[in-house]
């Protein structure tokens, strides 16, 4: 009973601590709208790197990774997170460019280069996807809480998770989000680093575990090179055009910090890929000694750590995983509300220029309203996998080239951005329908959409360069505009 009660106490204390952090940050650190939306653009290397990592590490990359290792993937499950680590390396090329824009959102940059239609279309796609992602993360958070406390109905757990997310995000904004990311990722990584050797030792060491495993479970490329490469491209595409990742680079104190944070995040995620994989394999080897272990190993990581590791370690890991899942939800929620106010309000006809106080108030109001809708969607029992697959694809397949290549190709024309957004989005939808959400013609839907977006971007540019069409305006501000923007963002501090 101790193993069940102690984690519960730690989880409750942890959630209360999150709310306290949000309240303190709201009172002490939030002085203007940029503090709330992009943490005042003053975050250091570790804050940015840990926040980038935490946004990709929740239940799916911890308990889900252990489940894959327990199942058919075996040791090759490590690629599920290691692929994300590898994808962060080319992202380091774009990171300083993202920070250099001095923007708040992706639609803002797309609009600077390719006009209002491109900005509005990108914002609508992003907001639609972020609604789905917020709903799925609330559902996942409620599911983790329900797994820890089965006596509480799932719907109650969903509502509880949603309320905590609303309060925390609404109070603390991006600063509180990054503080929690640092703590949560650190606790998960350290907790698993402590628990894994303990579990392996109880199992008789790695030699004993490997001897108890079928040969295919020890094949590092069991899932196949096509899947491994596909995952790397999939992560890169969703990271480069992902609002929650881009917003982290925008919070960096300078361009060098943004680039180095990408490299450090790659190292952190690579380390994180190892421990859940080993725990999943250990659970499979010890499955006859683990009462309560699900047939498919969905609870493999928590069961094996709960059985062998100290209760304090299990409790901290449980709390951090729940809160990391919630952190993904509040990141999506904050990005969504920021786009509604920063991009759609002005882009769709908002006449009144909002003051800093009005911007913060309206963004917080959007947080509450959007989260309530997301909670209702999560209560409808829509498939989390289906929501995530649709959301990740629809938000980045179209804008991928317009945003990413818009930063890197100075001579890009306006039409190249517009056409690439439309073509990439249509290609994703077609691939999603024809392939049934899976791989078709060796390509995942999101990768296919990004590929079509990129090809159409360059084809239009080559045609218009030959015709002498003028380049679109720059994605970057002039020196005078940068000076003015810094002054505006410093006002009120």
What are the language-model segments listed below?
Residues 1-493:
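Membrane-embedded helix-loop-helix hairpins and adjacent transmembrane boundary segments
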């Amino acid at each position: 009973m101790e193993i069940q009660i102690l984690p519960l106490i730690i989880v409750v204390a942890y959630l209360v601590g999150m709310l306290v952090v949000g309240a303190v940050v709201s009172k002490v650190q939030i002085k203007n709208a940029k503090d709330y939306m992009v943490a005042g653009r003053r975050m250091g290397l570790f804050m940015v790197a840990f926040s980038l990592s935490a946004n990709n590490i929740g239940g799916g990359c911890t308990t889900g990774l252990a489940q894959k290792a327990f199942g058919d993937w075996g040791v090759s499950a490590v690629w599920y997170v290691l692929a994300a680590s590898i994808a962060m390396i080319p992202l380091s090329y774009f990171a300083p460019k993202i920070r250099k824009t001095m923007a708040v959102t992706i639609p803002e940059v797309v609009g600077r280069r390719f006009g209002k239609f491109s900005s509005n279309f990108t914002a609508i796609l992003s907001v639609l996807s972020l609604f789905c992602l917020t709903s799925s993360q609330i559902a996942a958070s409620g599911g983790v809480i329900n797994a820890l406390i089965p006596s509480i109905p799932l719907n109650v757990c969903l509502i509880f998770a949603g309320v905590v997310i609303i309060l925390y995000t609404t109070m603390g904004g991006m600063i509180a989000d990054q503080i929690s990311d640092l703590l949560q990722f650190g606790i998960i990584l350290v907790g698993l680093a402590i628990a894994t050797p303990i579990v392996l030792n109880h199992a008789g060491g790695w030699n004993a575990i490997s001897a108890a495993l079928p040969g295919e479970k020890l094949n590092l490329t069991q899932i196949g090179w096509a899947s491994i490469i596909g995952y790397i491209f999939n992560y890169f595409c969703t990271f480069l055009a992902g609002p929650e990742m881009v917003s982290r680079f925008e919070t960096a104190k300078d361009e060098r910090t943004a680039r180095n944070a990408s490299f450090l995040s790659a190292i952190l995620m690579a380390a994180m890929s190892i421990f859940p994989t080993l725990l999943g394999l250990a659970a499979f080897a010890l499955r006859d000694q683990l009462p309560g272990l699900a047939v498919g190993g969905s609870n493999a990581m928590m069961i094996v750590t709960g059985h062998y590791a100290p209760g304090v370690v299990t409790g901290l890991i449980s709390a951090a995983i729940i809160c990391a899942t919630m952190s993904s939800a509040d990141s999506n929620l904050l990005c969504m509300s920021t786009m509604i106010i920063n991009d759609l309000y002005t882009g769709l006809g908002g006449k009144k220029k909002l003051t800093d106080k009005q911007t913060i108030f309206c963004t917080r109001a959007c947080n509450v309203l959007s989260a309530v809708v997301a909670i209702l969607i999560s209560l409808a029992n829509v498939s989390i996998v289906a929501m995530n697959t649709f959301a990740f694809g629809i938000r980045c397949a179209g804008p991928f080239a317009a945003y990413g290549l818009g930063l890197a190709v100075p001579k890009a024309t306006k039409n190249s951005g517009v056409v690439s957004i439309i073509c990439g989005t249509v290609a994703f939808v077609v691939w999603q329908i024809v392939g049934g959400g899976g791989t078709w013609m060796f390509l995942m839907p999101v990768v296919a959409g990004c590929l079509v977006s990129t090809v159409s971007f360059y084809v239009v540019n080559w045609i218009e360069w030959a015709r002498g069409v003028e380049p679109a305006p720059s994605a970057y501000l002039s020196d005078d505009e940068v000076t003015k923007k810094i002054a505006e963002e410093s006002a009120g501090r």
